[in-house]
């Protein structure tokens, strides 16, 4: 069968790589993709991701059997709806169901209604009310802008001054807009991907841990993710089971009960508190860079899992008996302003590197985004995989990239 992947980043690179391995898949297309994907897929950078009509026309022309949507924006914009209306099979939720990521308030309200464990929250609609609220709120407080923010719309404020600054950032010159304040939760964070079809929820039996902050020791601003690893040895199978029972199954049932037909992967960003696992966020797609490490460890056929889910079967994932560590190299300045067009070399176009922000300029690759390339390390345990990942990092040549030196350290410190 012919499969079309939508997206241009490292997550989509990993999806294309994994789908290309499937005996069920004859051809993988990627729109818009990036040139690093050309060994495994037919890449069409000339078609832009927001051009839904061009994507539809391409899918018709190439007799595409399945479309796999990687990023959140096309889901929120209703690409899945348009494709389904024209008879295509799509892995990714429709516009209505994608609100679970598109609106933090939508997600909080549905969790509140169905008693799904999450932090207490307060919504405000005006800047002046936000400034009033923080005068007496408990610190630290988590400040979230409603809507999509590429993983960067969350600020943890430890002081009133930091909270005021967060509000200024969220509102800018506007006086109105929805901001959600949340009680700060303490504990170990983890990411659980769950395949969902209506009220059928099939969680991965392997979790990953992301590293959101830009710099070592979890310092600096939030990013889209500076690295990840799996499995997470200090999060037990019992916690995974509890997360499934108290979060994954209830949210699938809640969404269907509210009239939202979710089909795709639901990302559960959770935290293990002293009171058990609680939801930090939901995403309507694979995490990035979690997808890269999880799909590298997945032994079973991703395409078969998607078909099983479509047929309402409780698919069984199989995993390699190894650990995976992924370290992200990003443009200096990210997640704030950064330069583009800097040469990057030293890496191979294979499963050891997944590219997020590079483009071809002549025969060389140059930076084109904030997060640039993820180096994948493999090993019998986390320590060996971490060593292998940083060896792969050291092979990359560029004067304009930075990376964290402590990806997966938590797993080693908590042994």
UniProtKB/Swiss-Prot annotation:
Q: How is the cofactor bound?
A: Binds 1 Mg(2+) or Mn(2+) ion per subunit.
Residues engaged in binding Mg(2+):
281, 283
Write out the pathway annotation from the protein's UniProt entry: Purine metabolism; IMP biosynthesis via de novo pathway; N(1)-(5-phospho-D-ribosyl)glycinamide from 5-phospho-alpha-D-ribose 1-diphosphate: step 2/2
Please name the GO terms that the record assigns under molecular function. Answer: ATP binding; metal ion binding; phosphoribosylamine-glycine ligase activity
- Report the residue ranges that make up the ATP-grasp domain in this protein: 108-311
Q: Which cofactor does it need?
A: Mg(2+); Mn(2+)
- Top-level taxonomic group: Bacteria
**Biological process according to GO:** 'de novo' IMP biosynthetic process; purine nucleobase biosynthetic process
Pfam families to which the protein is assigned, alphabetical: GARS_A (PF01071), GARS_C (PF02843), GARS_N (PF02844)
| Name the record gives this protein | Phosphoribosylamine--glycine ligase
Give me the gene this protein comes from. purD
